[in-house]
Amino acid sequence: EFWCSAEADALARRVAASGGCLGGVLTPPCGSAVVTEQLEVLLRLADRHNCGVDLHIDEADHGAAQGMVQLLKALQRVPVQVPVTCSHASSLSLLPASSLARLAERMAAAQLSVIALPLTNAWLLARADDATPLQRPQAPIRQLQRSGVPVAVAGDNVADPWFPGGDSDPLALLAASIPLTQLL
């Protein structure tokens, strides 16, 4: 509801003036009409004020790619000229390979970018108090890149509950991310 308010418009003007992005979070379940409407309002607002969009999307170990599918549908109805970045995108890895390839092609056609957050997602996803996770979803970096989707690796947490080991050290982030995501 916030994105429909006068406050949101004022915020978008301030963000645009500072060169920033508008953002939000889409986690499963996200197929409701309310989510669709709010996402479309956010996209229109960002485009009207020339602000990029950064969505934390599909940071989940279930509901494969529900947020991304919703975003792509919204972008068909509300095409934008501003960059749209999708942070996390972990649950995309739960898709069968052929479905992931088709989705990645659609993402590339929509000119989406992805920021993978492997350390945060390894810490949070598939967490259980009484068991070590046997599978942890990660953004499918190589598959997305192969389809033409730009992907960056980053960290979005510094010594907080979402990743207590975060310390703003990009070399440590890269050193841990390479084996975790098998980038080499």
Language-model-derived ranges and their functions:
Residues 3-85, 91-113, 130-153:
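Histidine/acidic residue-rich metal-binding segments in metalloenzymes
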Residues 33, 63-64, 124-125, 162-163:
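Short secondary-structure boundary/hinge segments and terminal tails
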Residues 87-90, 118-128:
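Short, basic, glycine/proline-bearing loop/turn elements
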Residues 73-84, 120, 124, 135-184:
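His/Asp/Glu-enriched, well-ordered alpha-helical/loop segment
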